[in-house]
C-alpha cells in the first residue's frame, strides 16, 4: 500500500490498520522535519478515507472524484488549512490565524456530502497563533462526528500540551540515504549527483528533490563551491577580504540563497569534524573527501564544535529576517577568530 512513497513503513502500516478499524482516533499528528513526506502520505491517506469503496487499501480510481494534488485540492468532504496570502505584506503568512480555525470549526458542523467521512489536514500546525491554538483545542475537546483531522508539524514543542494529549502522534524519521539515492536515480538524476544529494539532504526526500531541481544562484553544487572556498580561505586571508565583493552578498540576492549557503557551511563543518575523528564513512560530501581530509588537519575539534554553533546562530538570524550582510560578516569573523586561536 502506497508503495510509491519511499520509507516510513511503520507509519504506512499504522494507517492501513486505521482504515480497517471499527473504532479509531479522530485526530492524528504527523510530526517530523520538513521534506520527509508527511504531506504526501497525509494526502494519500485522505484519498483512502474519502473513497467510498476502499477496503483498508488505497482509494480506488473508479470512485475518486477528486485529485488531492498541488493545484487541485477540491473535494466537498476535504478541508485543507495552510498558510494564507497576506495582502498587506504581499507574501504568505508564516502562521495559522484564528479566522482559519473558526472557519474550520464552522465546517465541522456539516455531515459528509459524498464520502463515508470528512477529512481535514492542518499544515504547519505548530505555527498556529495562540488564539488559533486555543480555538483548535476546543474543537478537539468536542470532536466532530464523521471527521478525521490530521495535523502536520515539524516542531511539536510549539504545540500546546493539551493538543498533544488529544492526538495520536506518528513520528516521521529521516529516510535511509540509500533509499533517497535510489529515488533520485529513478527520476533520471545522474548517480554521482544523486549520491551527494541523498546525503546532504539528511534523509529528506523533499529537500533532495528541491536541491536537484534548483538552478542558477540556487544550484546546490555551485553554492557548495562558494561555501567550500570560504573555508579553504581561512588559513590564508581575513574572511572579510573573501566576503567583500561576493555577488551573493548583494541585497538583490534572495535570502533563500543565503540560507542555503549557511546550511552548506554547516554540512561542510560537520564533515570536517567527521574527518577530524576519522569517521570517514559518515561523510555527507563524499565527493570532496580528499579535500576535507586535508582541511581537517588545520582544525581543532573544539573549534569545529564552536563553528557549528556560530553557523547555527547565523541560520537562526537569517530565518528571523536579521540583515543578511551583517549576519554573514559576523559569522565569518567569529569563525575566523576561533580557527586562528
Spans of model-derived segments:
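Flexible beta-alpha connector loops of hexameric P-loop NTPases
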Residues: 88-97, 125, 169
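Charged, glycine-rich active-site and insertion segments that engage polyanionic ligands
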Residues: 1-48, 56, 64-68, 145-147, ...
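Conserved catalytic/switch belt of AAA+ P-loop NTPases
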Residues: 109, 134-151
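Structural motif
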Residues: 119-121, 150
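Conserved D-loop-proximal element of ABC-family nucleotide-binding domains
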Residues: 129-131, 161
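AAA+/P-loop NTPase substrate/partner-engagement loops
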Residues: 58-88
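Short loop/turn elements that form and flank the Walker-type P-loop nucleotide-binding site
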Residues: 23-24, 71-76, 113-116, 143-146
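Conserved alpha-helical scaffold flanking the Walker A/P-loop in AAA+ ATPase domains
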Residues: 15-19, 95-119, 127, 135-138
Amino acid at each position: 500500500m502506497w508503495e510509491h512513497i519511499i520509507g516510513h513503513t511503520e507509519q504506512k502500516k499504522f494507517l492501513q490498520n486505521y482504515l480497517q478499524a471499527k473504532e479509531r482516533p479522530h485526530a492524528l499528528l504527523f510530526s517530523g522535519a520538513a521534506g520527509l513526506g508527511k504531506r504526501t502520505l497525509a494526502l494519500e491517506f485522505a484519498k483512502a478515507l474519502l473513497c467510498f469503496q476502499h477496503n483498508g487499501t488505497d482509494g480506488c480510481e473508479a470512485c475518486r472524484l477528486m485529485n488531492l494534488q498541488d493545484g487541485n485540492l477540491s473535494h466537498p468532504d476535504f478541508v485543507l488549512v495552510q498558510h494564507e496570502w497576506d495582502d498587506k505584506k504581499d507574501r504568505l503568512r508564516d502562521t495559522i490565524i484564528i479566522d482559519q480555525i473558526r472557519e474550520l470549526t464552522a465546517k465541522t458542523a456539516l455531515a459528509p456530502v459524498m464520502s463515508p467521512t470528512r477529512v481535514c489536514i492542518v499544515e504547519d500546525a505548530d505555527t498556529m497563533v495562540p488564539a488559533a491554538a486555543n480555538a483548535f483545542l476546543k474543537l478537539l475537546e468536542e470532536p466532530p462526528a464523521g471527521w478525521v483531522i490530521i495535523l502536520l508539524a515539524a516542531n511539536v514543542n510549539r504545540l500546546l500540551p493539551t493538543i498533544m494529549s488529544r492526538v495520536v502522534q506518528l513520528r516521521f524519521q529521516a529516510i535511509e540515504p540509500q533509499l533517497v539515492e535510489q529515488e533520485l536515480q529513478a527520476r533520471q538524476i545522474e548517480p554521482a549527483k544523486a549520491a551527494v544529494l541523498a546525503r546532504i539532504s539528511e534523509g529528506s526526500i523533499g529537500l533532495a528533490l528541491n536541491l536537484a531541481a534548483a538552478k542558477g544562484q540556487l544550484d546546490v553544487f555551485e553554492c557548495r563551491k562558494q561555501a567550500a572556498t570560504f573555508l579553504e580561505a581561512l588559513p590564508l586571508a581575513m574572511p572579510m577580504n573573501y566576503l567583500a565583493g561576493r555577488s551573493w552578498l548583494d541585497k538583490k540576492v534572495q535570502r533563500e540563497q543565503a540560507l542555503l549557503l549557511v546550511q552548506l557551511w554547516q554540512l561542510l563543518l560537520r564533515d570536517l569534524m567527521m574527518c577530524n575523528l576519522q569517521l570517514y564513512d559518515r561523510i555527507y560530501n563524499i565527493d570532496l573527501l580528499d579535500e576535507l581530509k586535508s582541511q581537517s588537519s588545520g582544525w581543532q575539534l573544539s573549534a569545529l564544535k564552536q563553528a557549528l554553533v556560530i553557523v547555527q546562530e547565523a541560520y537562526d538570524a537569517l530565518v528571523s529576517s536579521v540583515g543578511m550582510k551583517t549576519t554573514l560578516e559576523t559569522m565569518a569573523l567569529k569563525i575566523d577568530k576561533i580557527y586562528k586561536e
